[in-house]
């Protein structure tokens, strides 16, 4: 018994000594209940408590995994993986496990959101332009599709690019950022006629409404929990990307939520309780309503050390 306890202690010491604090975490998304955050680091998907702590590695393939998206009930995660060449959609339990492949086209597919009922995953891909499309047919200009979570045939939702989709609770409307041209999405302080805007799409009427319509970059919209306002990322005010907010009844009245100066805020998401999550300078942050940003401490143990065998 003493030998077993000693062995366990040695393993714990080994794990703690090899834990690292990762930088440049990407694709962060907070869970619907606000308790956990998934993120990508060096091509794998991890999960960490929203209060900080040890990160659990969910994928261990030699391929590149990215863009994790929570299901509305927080029990599943959809993500993109290039394990078969191009990026395809996969879905796995939120605690990790066997991933099921959902898409099989040769084009790369990037997940954006689940429908509120949890039955479909929406994704962007350049698969099929309609005959009446006015867009130049190129792989850089995607269409919006959905695929059943249970697997099956994909269906085109929009023939125009619609990225970072976010549904309201009713499922009748969703927000998205557009794409008008081929400008590098990582370019800073871009101003032109092809910068991204935030749009509202009514699924009942098919109406698109431009909510920001300006020369600078506005992107990554998310609904507030009550559905009356929108949080988004913008480079307005001659600064780096920060979090902003406007009421849907008055989208021209925009207020700043964060005021970071040196680096851009990326990968905005929100929980059902209104906790914001994003990355800044390669690290994770959360922010409660009417509160200051809080850095999330992340301890990451490489998977080779988590598979140690006791003597």
Give, region by region, the residue ranges found by the protein language model.
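Sec-dependent signal peptide recognition
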Residues: 2-7
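Short coil/turn segments that connect the beta-strands within blades of beta-propeller domains
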Residues: 33-35, 73-75, 117-119, 170-172, ...
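A flexible loop/linker signature enriched in serine peptidases of the S9 family
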Residues: 20-22, 40-46, 54, 59-65, ...
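Short N-terminal segments immediately surrounding and downstream of signal-peptide cleavage
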Residues: 21-34
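Conserved beta-strand position repeated across blades of beta-propeller domains
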Residues: 29, 69, 113, 166, ...
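Periplasmic/extracellular electron-transfer cofactor-ligation site
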Residues: 49
């Amino acid at each position: 018994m003493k030998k077993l306890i000693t062995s366990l202690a040695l393993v714990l010491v080994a794990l703690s000594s090899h834990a690292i604090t990762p930088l440049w975490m990407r694709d962060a998304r907070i869970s619907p209940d606000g308790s956990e955050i998934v993120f990508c680091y060096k091509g794998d998907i991890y999960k960490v408590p929203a209060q900080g702590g040890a990160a659990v590695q969910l994928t261990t393939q030699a391929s590149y995994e990215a863009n994790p998206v929570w299901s509305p009930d927080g029990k599943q995660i959809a993500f993109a993986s290039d394990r078969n060449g191009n990026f395809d959609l996969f879905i796995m339990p939120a605690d990790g496990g066997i991933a099921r492949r959902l898409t099989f086209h040769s084009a790369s597919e990037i997940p954006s959101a689940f429908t509120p009922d949890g039955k479909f995953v929406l994704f962007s891909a350049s698969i099929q332009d309609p005959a009446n499309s006015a867009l130049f047919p190129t792989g850089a200009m995607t269409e919006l599709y959905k695929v059943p979570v249970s697997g099956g045939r994909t269906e085109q939702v929009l023939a125009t690019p619609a990225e970072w989709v976010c549904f309201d609770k009713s499922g009748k409307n969703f927000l998205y950022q557009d794409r008008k041209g081929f400008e590098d999405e990582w370019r800073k302080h871009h101003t032109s006629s092809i910068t991204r805007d935030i749009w509202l799409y009514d699924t009942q009427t098919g109406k698109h409404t431009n909510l920001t319509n300006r020369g600078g970059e506005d992107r990554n919209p998310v609904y507030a929990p009550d559905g009356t306002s929108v949080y988004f990322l913008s480079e307005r005010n001659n600064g780096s990307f920060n979090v902003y907010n406007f009421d849907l009844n008055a989208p021209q009245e925009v207020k700043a939520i964060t005021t970071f100066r040196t680096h851009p805020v990326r990968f905005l998401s929100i929980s059902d309780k209104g906790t914001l999550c994003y990355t800044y300078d390669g690290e994770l942050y959360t922010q409660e309503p009417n509160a200051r940003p809080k850095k999330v401490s992340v301890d990451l143990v490489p998977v080779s050390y988590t598979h140690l065998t006791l003597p």
